[in-house]
Amino acid sequence: MLQGLALIKLGGSVATFKERPLAANIDAIEGISRALTRLDIPIIIVHGGGSFGHYWSVKYDMHTKPANYDVHGVSIVHESMIALNQIIVNSMIRAGLNPYGISPSALTTGHKPIVSKIKQIYAMAQSKLIPVTFGDIVYVEGAKYSILS
């Protein structure tokens, strides 16, 4: 069913300098973006948080288990991941690629994937866009949030 597709995990420790908060590894990101231009198959990118989201999730003691986390921390983690996604997407645009940033909260409900949205991402990749999503803090239910990694 999902043949002829490259799902690439761009680790946070590659995209960022994990020992320095909010420090993107621009050289690595741009090198990867240039390398992606040589692929001739549909691509989906998933990137980690590194010194962006991971840094803040540790600071606010957030985990993959749903819990009532500090909502200020939820905002900070989420916005830091959007910032890193923007850096990666912009690098890909400069390399001549066609990335499309997607927040993982648009793909889940109650910590479960929305199958139709996952299929939509595959269809986007088939149409020459490159979906770029990431690990993030997502709403689960009530006042509970969870790290989706």
Q: Each predicted region: which residue ranges?
A:
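Short acidic, glycine/serine/threonine-rich loops at helix termini
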Residues: 18-20, 55-59, 112, 142-145
